[in-house]
Amino acid sequence: MAVTKLVLLRHGESEWNRENRFTGWTDVELSEKGRQEALAAGRLLKAQGFSFDIAYTSVLKRAIHTLWHVLDKLDQPWLPVEKSWKLNERHYGALQGLNKAETAQQYGDEQVKLWRRAFAITPPALTPDDPRYPGHDPRYAALSADELPLTESLATTIERVIPYWQQQIAPRISAGERIIIAAHGNSLRALVKHLDHLSEGEIVELNIPTGVPLVYEFDKNMRPLHHYYLGDATEIAARQSAVANQGKAG
């Protein structure tokens, strides 16, 4: 049976991941730990014999720089890269920049978990005059006001991620191209929900760790056969637990 592989990679730890802050569309740098995670992911993919025909990422530098580090370790810095805002992290509205633990102390662990992980619940929205509104950012100048979020749930994130997947990425995988997507926790959760047909309840508990390659294998009809993380299982579980605990008051 012909098998085509896709690699999903959440960016390495960012400075705001390290500070336990809601990030969303805020364009923050990788932390030093995040850079090392990205380099390690590239080395691991190289050791496992992976190479790619094209890469996809968001327009946020923590994902872009993660991809750069990976492609450098794969000796594929020349690889074609498609960048799209549709692969951006979910927009966290007025929560962007706030510390997650402090927000949990104010509103409670359960409310913050719902804001972070529930399927259709949106955080408090920005207003268009807020400096954090993406309409003030030149990289989104070509987008209409209807396309620019004031806040997003996972459900509304899916509304931009899955059409992009279906129109731009899936046909290339179906044609046999080897693809890596370097993106974000929630844009990747949106894609995983679609690929694995997860329920709204199941997606709440899904945590994607930073800097760990997630491999999907598809048959010729683009049906996922199975998926698996590359790396040490104990370390991967620890990173998933760390993601889950970010929104707790402590």
Swiss-Prot record:
<dbReference type="GO" id="GO:0006096">
    <property type="term" value="P:glycolytic process"/>
</dbReference>
<dbReference type="GO" id="GO:0004619">
    <property type="term" value="F:phosphoglycerate mutase activity"/>
</dbReference>
<comment type="similarity">
    <text>Belongs to the phosphoglycerate mutase family. BPG-dependent PGAM subfamily.</text>
</comment>
<feature type="active site" description="Tele-phosphohistidine intermediate">
    <location>
        <position position="11"/>
    </location>
</feature>
<feature type="binding site">
    <location>
        <begin position="116"/>
        <end position="117"/>
    </location>
    <ligand>
        <name>substrate</name>
    </ligand>
</feature>
<dbReference type="Pfam" id="PF00300">
    <property type="entry name" value="His_Phos_1"/>
</dbReference>
<dbReference type="InterPro" id="IPR001345">
    <property type="entry name" value="PG/BPGM_mutase_AS"/>
</dbReference>
<feature type="binding site">
    <location>
        <begin position="23"/>
        <end position="24"/>
    </location>
    <ligand>
        <name>substrate</name>
    </ligand>
</feature>
<feature type="binding site">
    <location>
        <position position="100"/>
    </location>
    <ligand>
        <name>substrate</name>
    </ligand>
</feature>
<keyword id="KW-0324">Glycolysis</keyword>
<comment type="function">
    <text>Catalyzes the interconversion of 2-phosphoglycerate and 3-phosphoglycerate.</text>
</comment>
<dbReference type="InterPro" id="IPR013078">
    <property type="entry name" value="His_Pase_superF_clade-1"/>
</dbReference>
<feature type="site" description="Transition state stabilizer">
    <location>
        <position position="184"/>
    </location>
</feature>
<dbReference type="InterPro" id="IPR029033">
    <property type="entry name" value="His_PPase_superfam"/>
</dbReference>
<feature type="binding site">
    <location>
        <begin position="185"/>
        <end position="186"/>
    </location>
    <ligand>
        <name>substrate</name>
    </ligand>
</feature>
<comment type="pathway">
    <text>Carbohydrate degradation; glycolysis; pyruvate from D-glyceraldehyde 3-phosphate: step 3/5.</text>
</comment>
<keyword id="KW-0312">Gluconeogenesis</keyword>
<feature type="binding site">
    <location>
        <begin position="89"/>
        <end position="92"/>
    </location>
    <ligand>
        <name>substrate</name>
    </ligand>
</feature>
<protein>
    <recommendedName>
        <fullName>2,3-bisphosphoglycerate-dependent phosphoglycerate mutase</fullName>
        <ecNumber>5.4.2.11</ecNumber>
    </recommendedName>
</protein>
<comment type="subunit">
    <text>Homodimer.</text>
</comment>
<keyword id="KW-0413">Isomerase</keyword>
<feature type="binding site">
    <location>
        <begin position="10"/>
        <end position="17"/>
    </location>
    <ligand>
        <name>substrate</name>
    </ligand>
</feature>
<dbReference type="GO" id="GO:0006094">
    <property type="term" value="P:gluconeogenesis"/>
</dbReference>
<feature type="binding site">
    <location>
        <position position="62"/>
    </location>
    <ligand>
        <name>substrate</name>
    </ligand>
</feature>
<feature type="active site" description="Proton donor/acceptor">
    <location>
        <position position="89"/>
    </location>
</feature>
<dbReference type="InterPro" id="IPR005952">
    <property type="entry name" value="Phosphogly_mut1"/>
</dbReference>
